[in-house]
Amino acid sequence: MSQKPLWYRWARVGVVGFSIIATGSLLFKYTVPTDEQLIAKFSPEIRAEYERNREIRQKEQQELMKIARETAASDDPIWKTGRIKSPFEKDGRNTDPKLVDIEKYNRERGDEFKKSEVERAQQELREAEELVSQKKGWFSRK
């Protein structure tokens, strides 16, 4: 039995390895749905809940990034997680991992909505008063 040259064996290993990686990449690309496709397949109730909670998730992500920046800027060791309680530490067990208080967030959104409604009503009132003050009588000259 003749033995193949060393470069041939390494070339075969490279080709087989490349084909395995390329096959996996192509399968991943064409079989995994995008976020939009996945959301479109949800039932209407789940999709509505997903849309309702989108802002809260974005707020949590912003809060997490803020904490990560603070932690990175500090001189503490990397395993100290800042304000986030680690489940591996004794005082961090049995704590709620949520970064944003949902009730407080909804209350703030409601307050902002009420303020915008009041501002809009005041603007409409000013416009109406302005129209009334500009209104001319039948016999007035100007």
UniProtKB/Swiss-Prot annotation:
Q: Name one GO biological process term.
A: mitochondrial respiratory chain complex III assembly
Q: In this UniProt entry, which cysteines form S-S bonds?
A: none
Record Pfam families: CBP4
Provide the Gene Ontology terms for cellular component: mitochondrial inner membrane
Protein's membrane topology: Single-pass membrane protein
Q: Basic and acidic residues bias: where?
A: 86-99
Where does the sequence pass through the membrane? Answer: 10-32
Keyword list (alphabetical) reads: Chaperone, Coiled coil, Membrane, Mitochondrion, Mitochondrion inner membrane, Transmembrane, Transmembrane helix
Coiled-coil boundaries: 108-137
> Which compartments does it reside in?
Mitochondrion inner membrane
Top-level taxonomic group: Eukaryota
Q: Does the keyword Transcription regulation apply?
A: no
Disordered: region residues: 79-99
Tell me its family: Belongs to the CBP4 family.
This molecule's function is given as:
Essential for the assembly of ubiquinol-cytochrome c reductase. It has a direct effect on the correct occurrence of the Rieske protein, core 4, core 5 and apocytochrome b.
From the Swiss-Prot or TrEMBL record, give the protein name: Assembly factor CBP4
The top of its lineage is: Eukaryota, Fungi, Dikarya, Ascomycota, Saccharomycotina
